[in-house]
A protein has these predicted regions:
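Active-site microenvironment for binding and transforming phosphate-containing groups
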Residues: 1-267
């Protein structure tokens, strides 16, 4: 099945019970935005939970990772990731040393190395997938509200520029499944942070006309962050995790009792 979002085609691929989305124009990149289907986890982690710090059985999570990598035909032993800390640091990836795939505390990873899969985990926060087809560089980021109001997207672009001489106009970005604007209620602390970083981009905050409750548009905010850094091709998939818990894990939609879905990119 293929869906069109922002002018690009996204294919939903089914593989041995797993289901994931891929950008049809990124044939040079093995990549997938995985749903929660096709794993072995049970209860509220059912079934392709790839988060290891939420109470799920460790062996089940390990099997889920292996199934995910098999679906993309990448080597599980080569995959690397980071400890997500809701910041804006981006690192340049290197192969795992002595089996240690957790490279650092960060929310962004960049590489131009082939056969070095990047993987991250999500459940409402925004997956940021970036690819420069000219310099053959990939990047993967994680943006909650803190990352969004402190420049996670900008951090990815800057690291791609500094490490690999990427030009922003050549970088293509996909903003993956995450909580939608109409479901992301926030407090005044977040509203102030949005205005501090984005200035007069008032359309990023929506107010309930009756009670004044604020809602934050993470999708448009991250897209704007990339655009301000010179990125011309940013596509929002437009899939809300909160409203689609049958396909994706959602921290808010499932009151914190949930797993994490995976995103993988590899050259």
């Amino acid at each position: 099945m293929t869906i069109t979002a922002g002018g690009i085609d996204l294919e939903r691929v089914d593989y041995k019970g797993l289901a994931y989305y891929r950008h049809t124009a990124w044939d040079a990149v093995k990549h997938g935005v995985f749903t929660r289907h096709g794993g072995v986890s049970e209860a509220h982690w059912a079934s392709l939970n790839v988060g290891g710090a939420n109470g799920d059985d460790e062996q089940a999570v390990r099997v889920n990772h292996e199934r995910m990598y098999e679906a993309l035909d990448v080597n599980a032993d080569d995959a690397v990731t980071v400890w997500l800390v809701h910041g804006v640091d981006t690192i340049v990836a290197h192969p795992p040393t002595e089996g240690q795939r957790w490279l650092a505390k960060a929310d962004g990873i960049v590489t131009n190395q082939k056969d070095l899969p990047l993987v991250m985990r999500y459940a409402d926060c925004v997956p940021l997938l970036a690819y420069d087809p000219v310099e053959e560089v990939i990047a993967l980021g994680h943006a909650g509200w803190r990352g969004t109001v402190n420049g996670m997207g900008a951090s990815l672009v800057q690291t791609m520029q500094e490490a690999y001489q990427c030009k922003p106009e050549n970088i293509e970005v996909v903003i993956g499944p995450s909580i939608s604007p109409e479901n992301y209620q926030v407090g005044e602390e977040v509203v102030e942070a949005v205005h501090a970083y984005y200035g007069d981009a008032s359309d990023l905050i929506m107010r309930d006309p009756e009670d004044g409750t604020a809602y934050f548009d993470l999708w448009s905010a991250n897209k704007l962050d990339f655009e301000r850094r010179g990125v011309r091709k940013t596509t929002v998939m437009g899939i809300c995790t909160y409203e689609n818990t049958q396909d994706f894990f959602s921290h808010r939609g499932e009151q914190g009792k949930t797993g994490r879905f995976g995103v993988v990119m590899s050259l």
